[in-house]
Amino acid sequence: MKMPKHNDNYQYPLDETWTTAEIIKVTTFYQAIEAANEGTIATADLLAAYRDFKTVVPAKSEEKRLARDYEAASGYRIYQTMRAAQETNKQRFQYRD
């Protein structure tokens, strides 16, 4: 029996200085990553969520730190998921590592 990679009870890595709108954008992106790893998501929706995420987190160093924290908590890899999503030409996307 294959065990799930993620922990269902984890907190998203967030910055306490973000506004409510920014927290919603980042949380929506994390949920899109989860959808891509657990099932399927419209590729356009995932890419749009990433664009919104980047308006909140424009610095590459902060993005990498949040991605590390998110992977440690959830087991999902943002960089690999997004790289695969950006390379696909399919309307629906499902990440497989």
UniProtKB/Swiss-Prot annotation:
Cysteine disulfide partners in this protein: none
InterPro entries, alphabetized: BH2638-like_sf, UPF0223
Pfam family, one: UPF0223
SUPFAM superfamilies the UniProt entry points to: BH2638-like
NCBIfam families, sorted: PRK04387.1
Family of this protein: Belongs to the UPF0223 family.
Protein name as catalogued: UPF0223 protein lp_2149
Organism: Lactiplantibacillus plantarum (strain ATCC BAA-793 / NCIMB 8826 / WCFS1) (Lactobacillus plantarum)
